[in-house]
């Protein structure tokens, strides 16, 4: 076939497909290159040979089996590659898989798309189960346009980090096998970030694969906004520094004995500590000196942010509460990687899988639990300690298990919700409990009156979480309706509504200066909101699954977020950059808490462990270390396994005592 005929066939094909302007441009181009000679267009309707050629090409182009064959060959090649490069090469499989499926659905090959999806979904369920469950509902071309998740995938690109040799191996395969379909999908939906050096390991997947596109552009624009993450002016910590800092050892002993009167378990631990040998005391003194040195080094290397003014009218703190907080701060134990705490763990028994959430007051004296039967139960640990351990646990599984030795319940029962309770949290002084429920309401309870005071209505769907601000009075809530809201205790309408997440907002946390709140969502992002304007000022992208827990560092600069897969990510609020992921849990991370000075992070998980992390070293990585890939995830300093008890809640007290709570469950066989 001579070039003239080929050009005629191409023009005929373009006209058949409706690309008349392209056909016209090709005719004019050919006319110019042939020195003005006329270009004779072929009527492909009257040319059997041309019609046959066009039809065969069109059939091959629309053949749904090409997707399955192309993906299967690419998959086999990647799995059979050398172990050194296999993991990097496998990173392209998930983006190619989802776009092959959506292309098949978009072309109307529904049955072939379902067969393709079911054949290869097991390869990706471990990491992308929730995404696959959403894609499973895409069954027609109209679904691709209607479903926001599918639209975002079609418009976005995936950034994948490849070493130079892995990238060359992939290109060589695509060209040698003439895999034009796979090449087109990869070219359209994947951006490769090629670096020199050795391939990265499987533990680097979180940073190596990120979604870019219109959403990423929006996030980059938002993350350029300036935020004031410093602490408030004239804070209690500043007053403490001005008045002389820590108390003497004798004053510390008085503070510890007073704190022990409020909590029997703390009293017993203090007595045991007093019975320790002088050698142990010497070791503790050395550890304290080492910790002090570490703290001094940190103050030299990390300059604090300028103090800021509150954007909300904060409540006036009573003198008694202020003095109590200052006393706790003076007696606070300095923690570090060489001076780690133990855990005081509260275990719920006989819950019959009904415990949804739990919370601990700032000093550990009160413990609350929210249950599926719409009830809230509050235990006063000081009273229980005085009554003896018999009040804590029943000997049998009867209906009288809540009755203590004196004929009274060992807890206070709060009834008012009409659906499962998903969060219950104490106010900073411990005089109120805030609860949220599937009945779409938030309720405020008094721990002194043991009664419901206010019912807040505004959300349209179940409310997953509600948290008091660090100074009380204000609180934030988040819901299945994809919004977060800010409330004050004296008003039944929300003060602000934060909208922007693409899915459920699962958790909420206040910034220490009360000018911002952070929200974690099932859309795998964390957002930071300005409470005064209601605007989103930061979007943190990097999680692979729904975000279930959040914690702010005491200095307000860093944030930790935990997800359903067990990954914890450390974020710098000023730059919206992930400092380092913390890998170690193998199930949902339900609770996070920073120590008082911010040197340690505690995490509680459904894998029945509490882990301690040294977060100070993770925040001191240089740019050169990050560029060279030396920002390896920190291993936990210490792991505390529980007795088949998933950790629902944990928190550091103001004196740096670590409390945790969970419901015992039957161990898996």
From Swiss-Prot:
Keywords recorded for this protein, A-Z: Activator, Nucleus, Repeat, Transcription, Transcription regulation, WD repeat
Top-rank lineage group of the source organism: Eukaryota
Record Pfam families: TFIID_NTD2, WD40
PROSITE patterns reported in the protein's UniProt record: WD_REPEATS_1, WD_REPEATS_2, WD_REPEATS_REGION
CDD domains per the UniProt record, alphabetical: TAF5_NTD2, WD40
Biased segments, Basic and acidic residues type: 249-271
Cystines in this chain: none
Family: Belongs to the TAF5 family.
Its job: TAFs are components of the transcription factor IID (TFIID) complex that is essential for mediating regulation of RNA polymerase transcription.
Name of the molecule in the record: Transcription initiation factor TFIID subunit 5
């Amino acid at each position: 076939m001579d070039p003239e005929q080929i050009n005629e066939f191409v023009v005929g094909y373009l006209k058949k497909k409706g690309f008349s302007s392209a056909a016209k441009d090709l005719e004019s181009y050919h006319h110019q290159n042939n020195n003005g000679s006329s270009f004779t267009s072929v009527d492909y309707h009257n040319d059997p040979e041309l019609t046959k050629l066009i039809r065969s090409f069109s059939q091959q182009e629309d053949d749904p089996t090409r997707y399955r064959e192309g993906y299967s060959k690419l998959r086999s090649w990647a799995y059979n590659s050398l172990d050194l490069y296999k993991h990097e090469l496998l990173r392209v499989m998930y983006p190619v898989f989802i776009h092959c499926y959506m292309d098949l659905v978009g072309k109307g090959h529904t049955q072939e798309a379902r067969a393709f999806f079911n054949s290869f979904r097991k390869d990706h369920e471990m990491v992308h189960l929730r995404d696959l469950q959403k894609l499973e509902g895409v069954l027609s071309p109209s679904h691709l346009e209607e479903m926001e998740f599918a639209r975002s995938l079609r418009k976005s690109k995936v950034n994948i980090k490849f070493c130079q040799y892995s990238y060359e191996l992939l290109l060589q395969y695509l060209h040698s096998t003439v895999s034009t379909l796979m090449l087109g999908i990869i070219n359209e939906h994947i951006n490769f970030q090629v670096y020199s050096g050795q391939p990265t390991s499987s533990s680097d997947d979180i940073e190596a694969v990120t979604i870019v596109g219109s959403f990423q552009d929006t996030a980059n624009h938002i993350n350029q906004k300036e935020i004031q993450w410093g602490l408030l002016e004239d804070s209690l910590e500043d007053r403490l520094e001005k008045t002389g800092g820590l108390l003497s050892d004798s004053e510390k002993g008085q503070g510890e004995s007073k704190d022990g009167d409020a909590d029997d378990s703390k009293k017993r631990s203090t007595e045991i500590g007093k019975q320790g040998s002088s050698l142990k005391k010497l070791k503790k003194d050395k550890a304290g000196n080492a910790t002090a040195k570490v703290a001094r080094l940190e103050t030299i290397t990390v300059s604090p942010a300028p103090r800021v003014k509150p954007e909300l009218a904060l409540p006036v703190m009573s003198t008694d509460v202020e003095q109590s907080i200052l006393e706790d701060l003076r007696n606070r134990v300095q923690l570090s990687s060489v001076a780690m705490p133990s855990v005081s763990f509260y275990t719920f028994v006989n819950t019959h899988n009904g415990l949804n959430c739990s919370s601990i007051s700032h000093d550990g004296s009160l413990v609350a639990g929210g249950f599926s039967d719409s009830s809230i139960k509050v235990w006063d640990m000081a009273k229980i300690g005085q009554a003896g351990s018999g009040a804590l646990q029943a000997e049998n599984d009867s209906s009288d298990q809540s009755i203590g030795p004196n004929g009274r319940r060992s807890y206070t029962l709060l009834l008012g919700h009409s659906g499962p309770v998903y969060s219950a949290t104490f106010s900073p002084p411990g005089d109120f409990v805030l609860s949220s429920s599937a009945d779409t309401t938030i309720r405020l309870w008094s721990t002194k009156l043991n009664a419901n005071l206010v019912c807040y209505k505004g959300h349209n769907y179940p409310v997953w979480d509600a948290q008091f601000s660090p100074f009380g009075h204000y609180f934030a809530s988040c819901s299945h309706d994809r919004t977060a809201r800010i409330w004050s205790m004296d008003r039944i309408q929300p003060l602000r509504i934060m909208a922007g997440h693409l899915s459920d907002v699962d958790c909420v946390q206040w910034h220490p200066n009360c000018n911002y709140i952070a929200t974690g969502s099932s859309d795998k992002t964390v957002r930071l909101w300005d409470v005064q304007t209601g605007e989103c000022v930061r979007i943190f992208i990097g999680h692979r699954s729904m975000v279930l827990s959040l914690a702010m560092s005491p200095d307000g600069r860093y944030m930790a977020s935990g997800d359903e897969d067990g990954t914890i990510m450390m974020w710098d609020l000023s730059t919206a950059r992930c400092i380092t992921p913390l890998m170690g849990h193998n199930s949902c991370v339900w609770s996070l808490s920073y120590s008082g000075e911010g040197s340690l992070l505690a995490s509680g998980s459904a894998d029945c462990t509490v882990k301690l992390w040294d977060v100070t070293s993770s925040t001191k990585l240089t740019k050169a270390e990050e560029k060279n890939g030396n920002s390896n995830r920190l291993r936990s300093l210490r792991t505390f396994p529980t007795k088949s008890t998933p950790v629902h809640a944990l928190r550091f007290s103001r004196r740096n005592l670590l409390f945790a709570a969970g419901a015992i469950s039957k161990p898996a066989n």
